[in-house]
Amino acid sequence: HPTNDFNYYIEIIKSIKKLLPNVHIQAFTPVEIVHFAKISQKSIYEVLTILQQAGLDSLPGGGAEILDDEIRAKICPNKANTQEWIETIKTAHKLGMKTNASELYGHIETIEQRLQHLFTLREIQDETHGFQAFISFPFHPQNTQLDNIKPITSYESLRFIAISRLVLDNIPHIKAFWMMLTLPIAQLALAFGADDLDGTVEEEQIIHAAGAKTGQKMTTAQLQKIITETGYTPVQRDSLYRKIK
């Protein structure tokens, strides 16, 4: 939000934790943490420490897009740069906060840049061991300034998930986000290296604004059925990948 100050977000975390003390709060991408640091004139370490003390438990891995500043300058010039994203992730890990990692592929990046992103994540994980999962997002060009780009194919998405599983052997889990991939491709992804069918979403606006036609809601029972149909055993987990049932 362009006008809210850092204290606004601190109070949100405190309020949630006060109301629901046993709930695990995963919030704020590295890009948002960098934004908080800039508007509060604090270091990334200070921002994360304050949020952790307020009740923040872990971070999602969003905003990574492609960790290459040449690409970032073209597709997301106002977001945190590569070094800021990496610094935020490493700092969170050093503070004992788990995070996820992500990648947006299928836009203007080269194959080499797409793969280098994976190797960068692998190097971070070798150092910090703080990533829980990797999730890749195929770019949806419709209704964007890059709407002339041919959408990535389902085959390319499945191949990239398989490559991710091979390269990121030090990251425990690979997600298949059905809302980005479509449900049939996410189901197939379970045979291509993914082990986390994500997720029971109530509402999603970003990719649907870019023309996605997938649904916006999936129940636990529906996900269990899809996993069972594929020949696997569904396991419900919490935010730290601990088995619930």
Predicted regions and their residues:
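Conserved Radical SAM active-site core
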Residues: 1-103, 107-116, 123
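Auxiliary Fe-S-binding modules of radical SAM enzymes
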Residues: 18, 40, 94, 119, ...
